Amino acid sequence: MEEKTPENEQSKKTFDPKDSMKIEETSTNGSSQPSQPSNIKLSIGSILESSNDNGDPEYSENGMGNMNMNTLPMATSTPMSYTKQPSEAKYPNSVWERKGVSDQEENTSSVKRQKTLPTQSSGEEEAKYSHPGAPTATSADSISMESRPSNLSTSLSKTTSYPQFQVRQFVSPIISIDNSALEPFLNRYPASESLFPVTEYEYTPWLEFPLLYSSIGKFVRVTIDIKWLNAAINPRLCRREIWGTDVYTDDSDIATILAHCGCFSLLKPVRKIAVVDLYILPPLVHYKGTRKNQIESRSWSSRQDGISLKIKEVTWKPACASIFENSIHTLTLEERLQARLELSRSSTFKI
C-alpha cells in the first residue's frame, strides 16, 4: 500500500471538464514548480479565457503574455465540447438545405392560411342551383380550398386544356351556268356538213378571229404548238385573258380556254401538239366567270359585238421531228450549240 502524500495526490490530478483553464501539474523531487507537459489538450476557448483571467497588465496587453508557444501544441482538431446536445436536433449544413427548410415553412403557412378561408360560394353561385329544375352542381363547383394545390409551381406545371375550335374549310359556292339557249344553234346543220371545219388557224398569242356571223353553228380548227402550252413562254396564260365558262368570248385566249376546261395542266409539261375544234355561236347577254383547274375566268355583263366560242373536240398528236432536229445528230457538240444559238436569235422564237 502506498502512502497518500500531498505530492502523490497532486501528481494524480486529472483534467477537470468543468474547469478548462487548469492544466495538469506534476511535481518531481518535492518541488512545486510546473514542468513542461508532455500531452496537454487545450482548446481555443481555454486559451482565450486563461488570457483574460490573468490579472497581469502586461499579460493582457501583449495578448498571450510571456507564454511559450513551443510548449503548447496548436489546437488543429475541433474543439472538445463536453456539453451534450440533444441527438434529435438537426441543423442545415448547406445553403440548399436551409433554403429547403424555408420553402417548407412557407408551404405550411400557406396551407394554414387557406384552411382558414371560407369555402362557401357567393350568393349568386348558390342561387344558380336553387330554383327548381336547375342543374346539379358540378364537381368543379364543389372543390374546396383545401383540395387546391398549395404550391404555385406545381399548379403551373400542369397542362391546361384549351377549347379546340373547328377549322372551317373554304368551299367555293356552286355556280349554275345555263347555256341551254345555244343548243338550237349546235344542231342547226346536219352531221354531213359539220364534218369539216370552216377554216383552220395556226395559233399564236396574237391570234384574233374574224367576225364569222355567217358560220354560226359550224366550227373552226386551231392547231397549237407545244411551246405555246407552256406558261413560261406564252404570256397570255398568266394574264387570265378569258371571259366566261364553257362558252367564251371570241377575244379569249384559246390556250387558256383549254387549261380552264381541264384539257391540260399548267403544272405538268406538255409534249404533244393540240388540235382544237371550236363551235361558232352567237354572243350571250352575260358571261359568268368561275374558277376551274387553278384558273379563274372573268365575267362580262355588258353588250358584246363579237361571237362566242365553245370547245367541240380536242385531239393530241405527237410532234414530228423537224429538219433541224434530224440534221443536228450529225453535228458535233460545238456545232449544235452554235446552231441553237442562231435559232434562238431568229424571229421564229421571239414572243
UniProtKB/Swiss-Prot annotation:
GO biological process per UniProt: transcription initiation-coupled chromatin remodeling
InterPro entries named in the record: LCCL_sf, Rxt3
One GO term describing the cellular component: Rpd3L-Expanded complex
Biased composition (Basic and acidic residues): 1-25
Main localization category: nucleus
Region described as Disordered: spans on this chain: 1-156
UniProt subcellular location: Nucleus
Keyword Repressor annotated: yes
Alphabetical keyword list: Chromatin regulator, Nucleus, Repressor, Transcription, Transcription regulation
Comp. bias intervals (Polar residues): 26-41, 63-86, 107-122, 136-149
Function: Component of the RPD3C(L) histone deacetylase complex (HDAC) responsible for the deacetylation of lysine residues on the N-terminal part of the core histones (H2A, H2B, H3 and H4). Histone deacetylation gives a tag for epigenetic repression and plays an important role in transcriptional regulation, cell cycle progression and developmental events.
Subunit details: Component of the RPD3C(L) complex.
Family label: Belongs to the RXT3 family.
Name assigned to this protein: Transcriptional regulatory protein rxt3
Phylogenetic classification of the source organism: Eukaryota, Fungi, Dikarya, Ascomycota, Taphrinomycotina
